[in-house]
Amino acid sequence: MEEAKNQSLEEDFEGQATHTGPKGVINDWRKFKLESEDSDSVPPSKKEILRQMSSPQNRDDKDSKERFSRKMSIQEYELIHRDKEDENCLRKYRRQCMQDMHQKLSFGPRYGFVYELETGEQFLETIEKEQKITTIVVHIYEDGVKGCDALNSSFTCLAAEYPMVKFCKIKASNTGAGDRFSSDVLPTLLIYKGGELISNFISVTEQFAEEFFAGDVESFLNEYGLLPEREIHALDQTNMEEDTE
């Protein structure tokens, strides 16, 4: 009698499950077996196993998936963070390459500021002992002479812009030949290279407007080809971009 009842229940269940997929049929059958079993005759451990089998998508699986998703998110974050570190390393590498390139192309000594010459001997020593590839621009000035202060200020800017050029200044009274450099011919520019005087300009401020700046002096010297090609400040631009980020 019991056997006939079970057979009838299974036939009824199979009839209801004919429109589900294979996995759905199996899960429904497991659920049905759990419900049709006598609860008093099934051990608790077996009922738990049957329950888990009838519900494959249980909470533990969901928790595992959530943990996996969180783990993947962390991995993605680490990848993004690593990409950013790689980008920073690439920038540092490029900057180092640019520095190396500048050093190779800009061979020779570098200065970057204006040298104050105190005596005639120091003036001669600077001209004679400097490397032959170095251009030396000397401003002979005197305090109180019109245009001398402005030219000294222009030299400060140009020395920073053209570090391969040695910019110097000396008072006319300290040259040992003050009678040759009276206030009438000041300010005077003397340009040397390889120990030789290659150009000179007396009363040079007459070439400028009443008020002039470093750019005016730069243009004037460039007209005579006395300055090298100005260095491209790519490294400074790169640093600014990194600071911005």
UniProtKB/Swiss-Prot annotation:
Residues 111-245 are annotated as: Thioredoxin fold. It is found in: Cytoplasm, Cytosol; Nucleus; Cell projection, Cilium, Photoreceptor outer segment; Photoreceptor inner segment. It comes from Canis lupus familiaris. This is Phosducin. GO terms for biological process: regulation of G protein-coupled receptor signaling pathway; visual perception. The lineage of its organism: Eukaryota, Metazoa, Chordata, Craniata, Vertebrata. Keywords: Cell projection, Cilium, Cytoplasm, Disease variant, Nucleus, Phosphoprotein, Sensory transduction, Vision. Interacts with CRX. Forms a complex with the beta and gamma subunits of the GTP-binding protein, transducin. PANTHER family: PHOSDUCIN (PTHR46052:SF3), PHOSDUCIN-LIKE PROTEIN (PTHR46052). Inhibits the transcriptional activation activity of the cone-rod homeobox CRX. May participate in the regulation of visual phototransduction or in the integration of photoreceptor metabolism. Belongs to the phosducin family. It is linked to Defects in PDC are the cause of photoreceptor dysplasia (PD); an autosomal recessive disease of miniature schnauzer dogs causing retinal degeneration. Its main location: cytoplasm. Light-induced changes in cyclic nucleotide levels modulate the phosphorylation of this protein by cAMP kinase. One of its GO terms (cellular component) is nucleus. Pfam families: Phosducin. Residues 1-241 form the Phosducin domain. It comes from the Eukaryota. Residues 1-14 have a biased composition (Acidic residues). SUPFAM superfamilies: Thioredoxin-like.
